[in-house]
């Protein structure tokens, strides 16, 4: 292992199937889903369906993002005294710059609005992580660096995102990427927020650890004309496993950000075939997006929170978990997660 593991101390989630991490993860385990009609109609005259988060008021845009973010941050920090919050860096994950229909204010206004909503300040080491679906993995790498400096013991990673807006939906509808009655090769848009309070590994039993992080770039990304061989994702997986001092056959199952498109399922299958060199009886592939829809930057937080809940409640296939995420533009990320059970 080339770096100190990062411990997942507490999680928070807001999704279309639950307004907290426990309720969302229970729904994910039961494979519940809650799509609803949006205000928008596609080119065939059908209502566009989405996994929408229902809050106290019908907030939209930046306001809804900050309300959801505030909820998950409060959940993840529920055991931390308010006076300690200013010493905790907040790494806020948002949509990537190239996202169609991306809201203005994600790099500056959103962070300030969240602090105002919470009535709190976070550490000057806080940062915006605008990397979409791979953002939480990028933030995890940044958190590991911050924790490794020895001056802080906790970092808060939060993500908030929504694909439920007309500029975004109309783009994906024109590209035939939305799941509709006439298109099975698509995703259902979603929204939500997630938070992970992470800290230094103290050897405490019953904690999920991030022991390896890997990144790469896929040349044959979704919009390219190159044949898909999953080279980028395979490289990211190998890097994460090498970082953790593990091999693919040590992993018990995989949790990913897959949300419905055949391209990404094919990529995941190819990456598994390229990295798994010893036969295993089974190797399950979990994907929370089947219940929550495509959540963009929130996907990584949902993946890790699901892994954490599954380990703590002992309904996993084992304690070694591979997680991986992918952006449309080619960025790939993988994490090695290991649960230290009670002795």
Residue ranges and their predicted role:
Residues 1-141, 145-151, 160, 164, ...:
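Conserved "HGTGT" condensation-loop signature of ketosynthase/thiolase-family condensing enzymes
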